[in-house]
UniProtKB/Swiss-Prot annotation:
Belongs to the UPF0250 family. This is UPF0250 protein XCC3453. It comes from the Bacteria. It holds the Pfam family DUF493. HAMAP family: UPF0250 (MF_00659). SUPFAM superfamilies: YbeD/HP0495-like. NCBIfam families: PRK00907.1.
Length: 92
C-alpha cells in the first residue's frame, strides 16, 4: 500500500489509506475480531485488503488490515484499539 506526499516532511496525510498489522495468539478468532474492532473505531475497512497468516508452529497469527482514516485521531484510535486487545502481542 503506497502512502505518498508532495513533501516527505509532512508525515502521514489525511484523509488517507493505511495498513496496520497485529500479531497475537492463534485460535482466538483474531482474523475476524480485529477487523470488527477497527470498524468500531469509525474507520472505513478495505475488505479486500484484510489478510492473515499463521506462524509455522501455528501458535500465532498475524492479521493485516487496510483501512481509510479521515483524521489522525481516527488512525490513532484504530491503532490503540489493536494495541489494547488482550490477545495482541504487537502491532505494526
Amino acid at each position: 500500500m503506497e502512502i505518498s506526499s508532495d513533501n516527505p516532511d509532512h508525515g502521514f496525510q489525511f484523509p488517507g489509506t493505511f495498513e496496520l498489522s497485529a500479531m497475537g495468539t492463534a485460535e482466538r478468532g483474531l482474523e475476524t475480531e480485529l477487523p470488527r474492532l477497527l470498524a468500531a473505531t469509525g474507520v472505513e475497512l478495505l475488505e479486500e485488503s484484510i489478510s492473515w497468516k499463521h506462524s509455522s508452529s501455528g501458535k500465532y497469527v498475524s492479521v493485516r488490515i487496510g483501512f481509510r482514516a479521515d483524521t489522525r485521531e481516527q488512525f490513532d484510535s484504530a491503532h490503540q484499539a489493536l494495541r489494547e486487545h488482550p490477545e495482541v502481542k504487537w502491532t505494526l
